[in-house]
Amino acid sequence: MTEEIKDILKRYDEIGALILEQKLDEYGDKIGQVPEGSDAASFEEYIQDVAREETEKAKQTLESEPDEKLGGKSLREYFDSMTLEEKEEALEYSAVTLDCGVPASLIASIASEDRESVRDYCSTVIGDSAWTEEELDDQDKLFEIEYQKVKACLDVLIEMKEFCFVQAVLDRFMSYHQTKEFVAESIKDYVVGAAEVSVPILMNIIEENLEDGLEGPSEDIVIMLAEIGMALPSEEIYQTLRHAFRAMTNKIYAVICLAEYGDDRAVPLMKNYINRLIHISSYRG
């Protein structure tokens, strides 16, 4: 990758960081204005999320506008003029170097390339990269940073609506006893985006692991299904979540998933569970 491309990526990253700082300052004054009925911590998190969303919108606008330093091209048009190999190098450089991550316009530009070529590239990066610190072959590198290349490729696949790897991704995810939260989040984004493909696979994984208490990555699988169910509720999803609630060792996760799903039938289940906890606590006391 040329120094020119690196300099352009760094400049847009610096601008993105400034936009985020401005948005956080803009919304920072509202953090103390907690609405009645809300707790301060949740409201602060909400305000920060809003600031980040506004930042992303501003960055997308910035990346689509003509830039004199790019010869009148927008950043997206600049990326479109590059070869796929150059884009791949830029994606990996951005993923591990830039504070703001890979530009959305670069993700979109790669996603518009020849489908098979992009699919092969993403498959190689996702398959060959470490998903745990133990798998990282270079101990001088930071796992969280190196994993960003996997996340970036998953983002490309989401942009392409290419979900042929859902089964393989979930098989590998389930092979670990435990993963970092940022790994689970990136997998969730891909799996939830592929709802029509993912639902039967997720339900099957849950059913296969009921007797083991749905611990470790199985907890994340239940969370993924619940999130899909929020947007696409169905009787099959509810029944699977109900079975998961009864089987999960960590009932807190189960309660959260049922609550997020939003089915009225979940309320008695949660009430009965809470009542049992109170009864057990009183008995032990």
Residue ranges and their predicted role:
Residues 1-26, 82-125:
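Short, intrinsically disordered, low-complexity segments enriched in Ser/Thr and Pro
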Residues 1-60, 78:
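Secondary-structure boundary/capping micro-motif
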Residues 8-11, 78, 121, 152, ...:
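Charge-rich, solvent-exposed alpha-helical interaction surfaces
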Residues 52-69, 264-267:
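Hydrophobic/aromatic-rich, well-ordered segments within soluble, folded domains that form packed cores
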Residues 63-82:
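Charged, gly/pro-enriched flexible loop segments at helix/strand junctions
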Residues 84-92, 114-139, 160-174, 196-209, ...:
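Amphipathic alpha-helical scaffolding segments comprising HEAT/armadillo-like alpha-solenoid repeats
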Residues 92-113, 137-162, 171, 181-197, ...:
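Structural detector for internal amphipathic alpha-helices that build alpha-solenoid repeat scaffolds
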Residues 177-178:
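Ankyrin repeat arrays, specifically the small/polar loop and inter-repeat linker segments at the C-terminal end
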